[in-house]
Design a protein with these regions (language model features):
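Membrane-anchoring hydrophobic helices of lipid-metabolizing enzymes
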Residues: 1-88, 98-102, 127, 132
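Soluble catalytic domains of membrane acyltransferases
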Residues: 70-234
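Short, cationic low-complexity segments
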Residues: 237-238
C-alpha cells in the first residue's frame, strides 16, 4: 500500500524573499559601536573560549543535532582541499537553534566563528556567552566597521572558518535557496580566501512528521582574479 506524504505542520506565505522574517524571537538589539571589542586582548579570553566552545557548545551541538534534527553530513572530505587555511562558509538560514550548531559539527575540528545580527549578543544572559562561542555581530556604524573587518581578517589568518548566512532572515524548514545580495561575498573577495557552500536539506522520516536534516558541503570556491572586485563577488554568489 502506497503511503502518502504527511500534511505540512504549518504553511507560511511570503511576499519578500529578502526581508520577510519568520523567526519567533523578539529581541531588542544592542548598538554595536566602536567601543565593542571583537578581539578581546585579555589573557583569560582564550581559556574562556575553549571552555565555552569546546567543552560546552560542541557537546550541546552534537546532542541537539543528533537527537532533535537527526542530522547527517555529506561530502565533508572537500574540507581537506584547504588544509589549515582559513575559509568562509555560506549556508541557507532555516533553523533558529540548529543553524548555530550544524556548522560546528559539519566543520569539526575547525574553530568556527559566525557573522551574526546584533540580536545574538543582546540577550540578557546568553548574549554574554555568544562572543565566546564565536559570534561576530554586524557593526551599527562606520566607526565600528574597521574593528569588525580586522577581526574577520585575524580569524581567517589564524585558520578559523567564518560562517555567513547571507539570506539574513530565518525561514524555518524552507527547502529552496533564497535570493541574497552579492555584497555578502565581499569577505572572501577582499581577503582572497576560499569559501564553501553549506546547504541544509530536509528529508521525510518514516515514523515522524518532523524531517531529518542532511547537510551538504561543496567547494572550495575561489575569487576569479580575471574579474574586477565587484564582478568577483557576483561570480562567487552565482
Amino acid at each position: 500500500m502506497k503511503t502518502q506524504a504527511p500534511p505540512p505542520i504549518k504553511t507560511v506565505y511570503y511576499t519578500d524573499a529578502r526581508n520577510d522574517e519568520f523567526s519567533s524571537a523578539q529581541i531588542e538589539p544592542r548598538r554595536i559601536d566602536e567601543s565593542y571589542r571583537y578581539i578581546d586582548p585579555r589573557p583569560g579570553w582564550k581559556a574562556a573560549r575553549f571552555v565555552a566552545y569546546r567543552l560546552f557548545a560542541m557537546p550541546a551541538a552534537f546532542l541537539y543535532c543528533k537527537l532533535a534534527l537527526h542530522a547527517r553530513f555529506e561530502n565533508r572530505q572537500v574540507l581537506k582541499a584547504v588544509g589549515k587555511t582559513g575559509c568562509f562558509v555560506y549556508g541557507n538560514h532555516t533553523q533558529q537553534v540548529g543553524d548555530p550548531f550544524l556548522p560546528n559539527l559539519a566543520l569539526f575540528p575547525k574553530s568556527v566563528y559566525m557573522i551574526v545580527h546584533p540580536n545574538n549578543v543582546s540577550m540578557p544572559v546568553l548574549g554574554k556567552l555568544t562572543p565566546y562561542l564565536g559570534a561576530l555581530p554586524l557593526p551599527s556604524n562606520i566607526k565600528a566597521m574597521r574593528s569588525f573587518l580586522d577581526a574577520i581578517r585575524t580569524r581567517i589568518e589564524e585558520g578559523s572558518f567564518i560562517v555567513v548566512y547571507p539570506e539574513a532572515h530565518i525561514w524555518p524548514y524552507y527547502t529552496g535557496i533564497r535570493d541574497f545580495p552579492a555584497t555578502s561575498m565581499k569577505y572572501p573577495v577582499e581577503l582572497d580566501a576560499p569559501s564553501f557552500a553549506l546547504t541544509t536539506t530536509y528529508h521525510r522520516r518514516r515514523f515522524s512528521r518532523k524531517p531529518r536534516t542532511v547537510t551538504y558541503l561543496d567547494g572550495p570556491f575561489y575569487p576569479d582574479h580575471s574579474l574586477p572586485p565587484r564582478a568577483r563577488a557576483q561570480a562567487l554568489r552565482d
